[in-house]
Every structure is written in C-alpha cells, then in structure tokens.
Amino acid sequence: MANGVAFVRRDASNMRDWDPALYWYARAVGRMQQRPGTDPTSWVFQGCIHGVPPTITETNEAFSQCPHGGWFFLPWHRGYLWYFERIVRATIKEIAAEENITPDPSTGWALPYWDYALDTPTSDPIEDFTSRALPAAFRSPKMPDSPNGTKLTVDNPLFLPEKQATSTADFWQTPHRSPGTNSAFEVLPYTDINPFTAISQTVFAATHTRQTDQPSFGSEISYTSMDHFRRGFGELENVPHNQVHGGVGGWMGSVAGAARDPIFWLHHSNIDRLWSSWLSKDNLNPDHTSWLDQTFIFFDENGQIQKPTSREFLGIDPRDYGYESLTDGNGTRPVVVPPAQVPEAGERVLATAAGNPRQLLSLHEPTEVSLEPADAVSRAMRSMTAPSTPQNLILTVHNVRTDVPPGTPFHVFLNGPSGELDPAGPYFVGWISFFGAADVDGALHDHGGHDVSFDVTEQVLRLQEQGLLPDGPATISIVPSVPQPVAGAADAAAKATAPQPSFGSISLTTV
C-alpha cells in the first residue's frame, strides 16, 4: 500500500462490481462525453491527445502525440494519465455539487488500474471470470442510478458494444470492442500478459543495432524523437502493453481510437504501476538530459495548457499518487523463456517465405509456411554449434499489417509439430501484435506495416540439444492467441468482412 500520498490507485480486479471508484469514474466519463469536442476536458479531446480518428476534423498541437517504440513511452503516458485523472476528479466534484452529495466523493478518488496478471493460471478449466476478463463494470450495458443503488437501470458509459467492422468507414462509426471481448472469462491467456520478463530487466532503455540487442524494460533510446512505432519495443511495451490493446480489439486495438475506450485508462494505469514496481527493485531511470527535459503537451482540469517534462513524473510514487500494491500481478517465471524481440533483421539472408503478394493469417487456426531453400536452413541450424563461426540467427516476419484490428495477438512458432503449438512450450518464438499496424489508423502511422524480428539463436541451440530440430525444411506457424469461431456456410457475409491480418514475407538471416 502506498504511504504518504494524497491518492491511492486501487485494483479494479479486486473491487466489487460498482465500487465507488468505478461508479464515479463512469459518471465522470458520461459527463465528459457530453462536452463539446473542442473542450480540452471533454472525452473526445482527451482521446485525440493519444490519436485522432479520421472522423475528427479539428486540430490541436496536443493531438496525436502518443510515442510508442521509444523511451518516452512511459513518461508521456504517465503525464497523460495524471492530467486525465485530475480532469475526472474535477468532473466528479462538479456532479456531486449539482446533486448535493456529501461527503464529496472526489476528495479521495484515484484512477483504478486493471491488474490482469493478478490471477495466475491453473490446470482447471476456466469456468468464471478471471482477472484477465474486463472488470464487471466494463461488461455491463447498465449501471446503478445512484452511488448506493443495486438495480442496473442507467446506460453505462464504461460499456462499449461488440462489433465486427466491415470496412474502415464502418469501423469508425461508433466506439466498440471486438466480438467476444465483453463476455470472455479471460480476454487473453496468461502467457500474453505475464509481465515477468519485463520486470526482470535491469536496464530501462538500450540502443539496438543489427549487431547487438540488449533487452530492456522501457523501449529503445530515441533521444529527442517522439517516435511512433519506428524503433524497438521494450519488454513492458511488448508484453503486456501491446498484447492487451490487441486482445480487447475494436477501438482499443487502434492507436487513433484506443483512448476512447474507458478500459484504456485502467490498462495504462497498470502499465504505470509496473513501472513503479520496477523502480522499487532499485532499478534506475535514464539520466540523460534528452530524456529528462523532453516537453509534452497536456491540458489540466481547468482546460489550461500544460507543458511538463519527463523529470516531473519520476519516482516510485510520482507527484501525488501511489498504488495499492506494487507486488501483486508482477508475473511468474515462464517455463521456457521465449527469444528476445529485436528491432531489425540480420544482414545475410539465408531463407525466405513469400506471401505472393501477401499471406493472409487465419483467425481460426495456424497459418504455416516453409522457409526456402531448405538446405540453407539446415546448414544454418547446424552451424549454430560450430564455435569457429559464431553468429546470431534472426527470424523476421516482414510487413505485418491488417485492415481492421483482428481482436487477438498472434503467436509465432518455429518447427512446432501439429498439436504442440503451446506458448509455454519449446517451439514458441514470440508475439505479433497488430496495435499500430492497422490500416484504419490511416496517416497516423503512415510507414506501412511492421517488421517483427526475433533472435532465435539460443532457441535453435536448445531445440538441437533436445533433439527437437531435425534436418529439413523449417516451418513457421503463426497462430491466433484467441481463435475466432469459424463462420458457418450461411455466414458468407461474415467471412467476407472478417479482418484480414497479413504479412509480406518471412526471412531467416544472420548477424
């Protein structure tokens, strides 16, 4: 429990359905949604600070700032949440004054967090909502009509309907989540949100090159650039951050729409909590002035522009808030640690698999491709054990993109036999998230699809030692983390309008 701070952020996964913190959050969101989009304290304006949907024509210097894939990812989002929290608190105070509610519920209100890793997995079948399900207040279309009400009779601003968009225009009609999200006992499996690897890092940010890759907690050093998905993800931004965005899907799976889903703010509150937890283990933030003195643009509860720097949001208990727990939901050590994700492919191409021109990924079952030529793959695998020719093997899935968010991350496997594509098993390579790689984001991230690279050197050695990597073609399997139901023969329209995640090619290269 945080000590000596004015506001304590609590875990929504441990709250009763309509805990006062969630009730008043819903009331404030509803009021903010009623404000004109030009009001800096409105729901629309605050969402546009993260990203601007194509339906919004207004412009502002604060819009579309969100840095991803660079070392400002954590301090920028921390400042973003802090000013948003103040706006919500002031809105709660406004509502309570109008309704003569005492004591003032805004006095101790703090933004909750969603600790999706709180419940660790068991071998028992999942028959009820876990901490990886959306908190109950976000799943219900209705909410109580008063702080102590028990009947759900009022429209709930925290709830978004599920929808499978049929086009970019249809996607942006109304905020929504991917089909199945609201009713899921777990939005994602534990392996996709386990923050153990991130929390275990000792370096905040590193410079990645073709020759070296140093895993880091935060994302790649970007100096003074507020990058958008152009550099390397840190472990925390990769898992759980990107995977949760992709798992909730809908507008949460889009950079331009994410902050318009009320669960966004609880997701990022948990990401911020994990940063505080990492710092509590005597890890250190960067001390470079280009990181400390970077200026961001936000608006406060009075609608006044504020331009704080990173150095104003440091520490375990930054500014005036702390967290209920810095130890719960910090993850558990995986049985097999997957390969590190690296920002770039290697230099010498050994084998490829082309999409001709693009390979669509199945939302229902594994998509398998073979790397060719097979003899080059076999030679490369064998050379891993030759001490005279040290080299790293880099597996890259090129030009990953989708039309609309698919509502699930994907798992990548190397030579996994049919029926053994388990992310806790030895063949698991890593994740592909389509957050930031969707065509619906338009010009916000106009650099095309992502390249996702993994250093599979140690994995190949481990598979060889265990006799699990025989000579012959290398097969890459890409599997939806949460397979979608297969549409029946009568659902031809559903098949035709389903998301179309895809990639351009796959390569195996050396460094």
Where are these regions (language model features)?
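C-terminal accessory segments of proteins
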Residues: 1-511
